[in-house]
Amino acid sequence: MTNLLLYQRIAQQLAEDIRRGVYQPGERVPSVRKMSAQLNVSHATVLQAYANLEDQGLIRARPQSGYYVHQTPALTAPTPDIARVERPGLVTRASIIQQVLTEARRDGVFAFGAAVPHVDYLPVRALHQQLAKVTRFHSPRAFSYMFSPGFEPLRRQIAIRMRDAGVLVNPQEVIVTHGCVDALQMSLRVLTKPGDLIAAESPTYYGLLQLADLLGLKVIEIPSDPSTGISLEALQLAANQWSIKALVLTARLSNPLGGTIPEERQKQLLRLASDYDIQIVEDDIYGELMFEQGKTKALKAFDRLDRVIYCSSFSKTLSPGVRVGWMIAGRYQDEIQRLQTFTTHSACSVTQMAVAAYLENGGYDRHLRFIRQEYRKNLSAYQLAVQQHFPEGTQMTRPTGGFILWVSLPGRVNTQELHVRALEQGISIAPGLIFSNTEQFNHCIRLNCGIPWNKEAERAVITLGLLAQQLCREPAIPLL
């Protein structure tokens, strides 16, 4: 690729951002140095790109100040169609799930159970600095209500970041939420009513099962594979038998399998959803933790018919405590905003402003590179330890990102009993039982590898392995 083509590509991308309103008239675009570092290109290449944009009348240089947006052409935001839908299987695991979450927070417990990143992998100091600045310099606004759809500078930063997932959106299309589960629950509330059927991957995120139970929904579980994602064949069979109102899934780094749907199968999935008029709710909370960024796009990137409601959050990358997520609801935007206005309004004003400031300062990408490297090393270490210390016949997933590991033990091992015995040793795990409304994953566990690999972690894995070996030798224990 020549420099000429490269600078044209950079200019074209920035022009698109300006047309979509990511950068407003009179607003400064990234400096030459910042853009050069961000794209890993020379200063000369960026200067050529900016000169090209000046020729188009899109930006203008100000002496000793930088480049600013000069004019903004009309926004072009196509918003096509969508779907709807219904079927059986009530959710039951709520009390066990609550127990697992409570135990994972106890002092002195090694928390393999909850998928929460260790504090070493959170930019605590940087977030604290931004929170202090927000409360010091913007206190009247920071302590007022922030109504739906949320803090506009934050929505602009999210719109910029969505480009990495292959999704081009206007800031106006972004709705800030109280984390990803809040986005999921609002999606399901506008798509379904009590008694309706939704489809989900199996195994699936236990929070979705809790949410379905809360909303009075029935769940049909569609088998999923760590390498190829949800079974399209099984989904089609289900759609032929029942009226499915919505499909909730994760196309990139599913929880608990850590699987990613290849792009061709993502397109097939969208065609199938169109054929059967199924609305899709995409949970992309782990998407920014893929080890090879840009290799696989979000499902929303291929959504030409506005069939996907996209949901995500900063809980797995910045901090679970900030409770800032977002969604792109397409034709359901007005309905979602009305629902949000009369329930939660929007996420906390202070944290929205602090996260926006943190993203604007440019440290987020550096932070993501750091934690991706750490999680890749952690997963390798935990996988090796499980292989060495768990019973013969144990299998595990090979995630291409994130920090969760799905472990399948020999069939005799009841992991609910393993969970009980592990707690007696000060170790929390997530038994496979909670990831399904069936009992087919009773021999599986999910391990949180977002914990630094050290002697304590090694001892915890060895202890789990010994307990699993012990259960292998005992008569099978029936599930309660």
Pin down the residues of each PLM region.
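N-terminal basic, amphipathic alpha-helical segments
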Residues: M1-V134, Q337, T341-C348, L359, ...
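Conserved core of the PLP fold type I
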Residues: H138-Y276, G287-D303, I309, Y375, ...
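Glycine-centered flexible beta-alpha turn that most often forms the glycine-rich phosphate-binding loop
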Residues: D283
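Conserved core segment of the aminotransferase class I/II
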Residues: L127, R304-Q373
